[in-house]
Amino acid sequence: HGMSEKLRLDVFRIVQEQMSNIIKHAKANRVKIGLSQNKVDILLSVADNGIGFDVTKNAEGIGILNIKSRAAFYNGNADFVSKPGKGCVLTVSFPNEYSI
């Protein structure tokens, strides 16, 4: 099964938003993007080796809120794991029911 047209666009927009965040804030020189699908979920990950941030203090920026709202539209989840000096990993999961 593939992803629906709308979900493909929203996955693209999430990657675009996170890349914008990385370019503006992370000072990263490497980004790894992964997309996989299993019987339960569609999983997207975007990891960078940038300066990181404190997710308890910086989790309400407009970019992060946009990513979380796009995931929530599909009953999905967006999770940011980061610490200052340790880069950032964004993991987004969508229920596989949105594939076609």
Language model regions located:
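Coiled-coil dimerization/phosphotransfer module
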Residues: 1-100
